[in-house]
Design a protein with these regions (language model features):
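Glycine-rich nucleotide phosphate-binding loop and flanking beta-alpha elements
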Residues: 107
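Non-catalytic, conserved peripheral segments adjacent to functional cores
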Residues: 1-97, 110, 114-150
Length: 150
């Protein structure tokens, strides 16, 4: 069996005259990509301005699951031993992609809009995460944050 790689899937947005509803994890079956994975901790991170970089950080054991609930962000996940194994995802409140990062990948994000809020799910408690967390220079693998014109 090959090691899991980072991936994203689009979450359905339901909208009516009252507003929007976006299910993040509808049930445990959505976590079947990682047998035994349980979300132990949920938290949010907010960036005040566009262009703020959060990352890179790396976990050997911890899974992370992310979704943007306000604003927009570019996510980057890569294998520090093989940085060419790079995965880039865009998520926003308008098109909420759930981004899943398995252990062994350095990951981070840059806000593309002011007031961006990221909801995070983790397979580790806060205490477990402290011993498994390695911070890295956001430019250790070059400028992977800039949005390029097409």
């Amino acid at each position: 069996m090959s090691e899991p790689k980072p991936f994203a899937y689009e979450s359905k947005v339901s909208s009516d005259d009252r507003g929007v509803f976006v299910p993040w994890l509808k049930d445990a079956h959505e976590l079947e990509f990682a047998p035994g994975l349980a979300i132990k901790r949920i938290y949010y991170v907010a960036n005040y301005g566009a262009g703020v970089i959060r990352g890179f950080h790396f976990h050997r054991k911890e899974w992370k699951v992310f979704i943007i609930c306000c604003g927009a962000a570019k996510f980057v996940a890569l294998d520090p031993q093989h940085p060419e194994d790079r995965h880039t995802f865009i998520s926003s409140a308008r098109k909420p992609n759930v981004v899943v990062v398995p252990p062994g990948y350095a990951n981070g994000w840059v806000s593309l809009e002011p007031e961006t809020i990221l909801i995070c799910g983790s397979s580790s408690s806060f205490e477990e995460s402290l011993g498994d967390d390695e911070r890295m220079d956001p430019y250790a693998f070059g400028d992977v944050w800039t949005v390029t014109g097409r």
